[in-house]
Design a protein with these regions (language model features):
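Juxtamembrane helix-entry segments on the extracytoplasmic side of multipass membrane proteins
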Residues: 147-155
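Helix-coil boundary and N-terminal low-complexity module in membrane systems
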Residues: 1-136, 140-142, 169-303
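Alpha-helical transmembrane segments of multi-pass membrane proteins
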Residues: 155-167
Length: 303
């Protein structure tokens, strides 16, 4: 059961009775503290689904084999697409204040959109694999000639990766939405880009920085990927796009109903006990992750 089920109907941590919805970094911290359990669970599933793509594409790029890169990218993309849809749906669930259990919602989303997700993942991963192959080929050819690739080539490759990140982020954001009328995926993504280009580019930059950094540091980044690698940039990117999704597609946000006032006022000891329980409801996930990080660092330090 989601941690939010226990909180639905309660006052949130640091939220006053007449306080408006939190914005920016405060809202991000509120979602992380409230839904870290489902974020970590989704992150683990995304890691498992993306692992074949990471291994297959890296093998083709390392061997500088274009046929192997194309085949591995296209085949493993059938898993990468659903993974990105799960990630976006998980972030949207937190942004919507949805108190439902996260795993049944993830199953419903995949059941409704798995065909489109597989197609989106196949094409996106294929383009990513080709870009990685071209980058590796350019650097290898330059190294054999004894010089470094020029600035124009680096800028061109960086822009290609940025365009791919923006389009992939927008497609992943609009794919899980339940729309009254069917529409093509690229048209929905283009609509967001036309309405708020700055937000769309920023969301793509966040995803590129988070996931692209893991790709560059793979396999060293495996530990980071399992804990934070996908949900952290994914939640930040979806939060950036969420105002546009609310405006263009009417994505609803559930308000948290205030509980009925108690029959008699709480004593100071009861208020302290309730406050302590409320803090643990919101922050148990952060404490668990901090403990995992400390144990991991201690294990690596002492060999």
């Amino acid at each position: 059961m989601s941690i939010y089920n226990a909180l639905y109907g309660r006052d949130g941590h640091g939220v006053g009775p007449n306080e408006p919805e939190k914005k920016g970094f405060a809202r991000f911290c509120q979602m992380v503290g409230r839904d870290l359990g489902q974020l970590l669970g989704t992150n683990l599933m995304v890691c498992v689904l993306c692992l074949p793509a990471a291994l297959g594409v890296s093998l083709g790029v390392t061997l500088l084999s274009l046929p192997l890169t194309v085949v591995c990218s296209a085949v493993t993309g059938l898993l990468t697409g659903p993974a990105m849809v799960l990630l976006a749906d998980c972030a949207l669930r937190s942004l919507q204040n949805d108190p439902s259990q996260w795993l049944p919602r993830a199953k419903q989303t995949l059941a409704a959109h798995w065909k489109a997700a597989c197609g989106f993942g196949c094409i996106g991963t294929l383009v990513l694999g080709l870009l990685c192959f071209v980058s590796a080929f350019v650097f290898e050819a330059a190294a054999q000639q004894g010089y470094y690739p020029g600035l124009a080539i680096l800028v061109f490759l960086a822009l290609d990766f940025l365009v791919l990140a923006v389009l992939a982020t927008l497609c992943a954001a609009v794919l899980p939405l339940q729309l009254p009328a069917p529409d093509s995926l690229l048209r929905r993504a283009g609509r967001l880009l036309a309405v708020a280009p700055a937000r769309c580019v920023l969301a793509g930059v966040l995803m590129l920085a988070g996931i692209g950094g893991m790709i560059l540091l793979f396999p060293v980044s495996v530990f980071w990927a399992v804990l934070f690698g996908f949900w952290l940039p994914g939640l930040a990117a979806m939060q950036t796009l969420f105002p546009v999704l609310r405006q263009e597609y009417g994505v609803e946000v559930r308000s948290i109903p205030r509980p009925a006032a108690p029959d008699k006022p709480l004593t100071a000891q009861e208020q302290k006990k309730r406050s302590r329980a409320n803090w643990w409801y919101y922050n148990w996930g952060i404490v668990a992750v901090a403990a995992m990080v400390i144990v991991g660092v201690a294990y690596v330090a002492h060999g």
